[in-house]
Design a protein with these regions (language model features):
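Conserved catalytic cores of very large enzyme subunits
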Residues: 6-13, 17-167
């Protein structure tokens, strides 16, 4: 049994999260992060996606959970960043599944080239930069890993602060 009370609490929270995701929609930022990982595993394991899979606009997907949890007082930026960094480590350590078919013939890589986009615009055309966008930039800086690949999407609506921070 785990004797470190902090680690024990983390493990218990992970177990509680598993009662929700992936069978149900996430209710918290942490659950949303876990769902991202499960979705990534499912796609890369089942679909053999030509060495690349983009989980999409992570900042856009996570912002509602981040805002709800920070407003409820159950999440701060330090914990939000830590959870992103844990996900980054998972992406980095996840080799792609065994290649088959044309993918086997054309590729000799062992990584799955996850690609994270941040910034850009929302589906309604508004500025898409949000608090999670900045956390993703912090994560990229802190982790300095070659995977997941990370892109910054810019538009005329992108704040100068975000552009400077991304560079």
């Amino acid at each position: 049994a785990e004797t470190d009370p902090v680690r024990k609490a983390e493990i218990l929270q992970i177990a509680k999260n598993l009662e929700v995701v992936p069978a149900h929609a996430p209710q918290t930022y942490w659950q949303a992060i876990q769902l991202y990982w499960f979705t990534h595993l499912a796609v890369t394991t089942e679909l053999n996606p030509w060495d690349a899979f983009s989980p999409g606009r992570m900042d856009q997907h996570l912002i509602k959970y981040y805002e709800a949890d920070t407003e409820a007082g159950i999440l701060d930026d330090e914990k939000a960043l830590e959870l992103l960094e844990c996900l980054w480590v998972k992406f980095y350590n996840q080799p792609a599944p065994v290649k088959v078919g044309i993918t086997l013939k054309e590729s000799a890589t062992y990584t799955d080239f996850a690609n994270i986009n941040t910034g850009g615009v929302t589906p309604t055309g508004e500025n898409g930069v949000n608090a999670v966008s900045y956390l993703i930039l912090d994560c990229m800086d802190d982790m300095k890993l070659v995977q997941p690949n990370s892109n910054v999407t810019i538009s005329k609506k992108t704040p100068q602060r975000f552009l400077r921070r991304a560079c």
